[in-house]
Amino acid sequence: MKKMKKKLSPILSLFSLFLIIGFSVKGQLPAYLQDYKECYNENPRAANLQWFKDARFGMFIHYGLYSQLGKGEWVQLRDTIPLDKYAKLKDNFTASGFDADFIVQLAKKAGMKYITITSKHHDGFCLFQTKETDFNSVNSPARRDLMGELAEACEKEGLGLFLYYSYAADWKHPWFYSLEAGWRNARPAYKVKPEAYKYKKPEDFRKYVDYVHAQLRELLTQYPTIAGIWFDPIIGYYANPDVFPIEETYTLIRRLSPHALISFKQGANGDEDFMAPERGGNKKVGEQYPVAQRAYELNKNKPKEVCNTMQPHLPGAGNNWGYNKAHNGHHLKVDEVKILLGDALLNGYNLLLNIGPLPDGSVHPEDIETLSNLKQE
């Protein structure tokens, strides 16, 4: 287990700020873009997009408080776990088995060129250092900034790192929109609305947006070498698009990190850099919404990444990305992963293959076995 780094002194914090500023001003290359230097000097985002198209294969990681329950990442909503009860899972969050260096080495051994990890999932728990909420890994028994550790490990080994961020769902934040606003998964269906939920009218949502933008500033300045931001869930956006200032959000990201790529599944407004559907998904996702149809038409010829998971969809066990103990003994084997890779290569898209770490953050033994023996042809 890695020990928590000592609290930064004011002088060291100032030095870190200078490094961040220097990164932006000098246009320092992230390690994973070293082979794209010439293009980067002319257009950082174009260089990053070319790298992404060449990368072909990445690792997806769903890890958070929900991992402790072993029932998938939507367990709070599906089991309508009370807010206070779910929040107490933080008291047992140690991440004692989370080893960023091991994860990066495993990804490299499997032939993966990048990692995408849940910095904040729908439950609102953050795996990074943030001043915006105490509902985070640094303020848990783990006392660790897991995103910082993984960013450092990826930079050291030349892998790209995308940060998954749940923009269109947050079951913890008081000002996210309510069930009455039009989406059945906006909040768990509690019989009595929690007092912590404050949203009453569309104007209230701006308080949540300000929170998101503040956290994006943290992510893009604390980890300036990340490859981009991977937003989710798109249906939460399609159901209520008018409350999301999506252009403002994208402008913020591109101002703070000129090379950063942006994805939001099939697309929110068509200004995304690549499409990122699930399991070969297409425009059928959200096709009942006109905004979805417009975004799809604008994005359909852009690079595409399809995510799939090492945990198969088993009858009665759910369709999960976070750890589900019901899937033990059924994770994908080498031949099954090769089929997914072959399909991706044949159809010209990237494969983002998910693992759901165990409650302590360690990689599932079945996934270690498969990825360690996966030989790309």
PLM regions and their residue ranges:
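Bacterial Sec-dependent N-terminal signal peptides
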Residues: M1-A31
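Mature catalytic domains of secreted/periplasmic carbohydrate-active enzymes
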Residues: Q28-E377
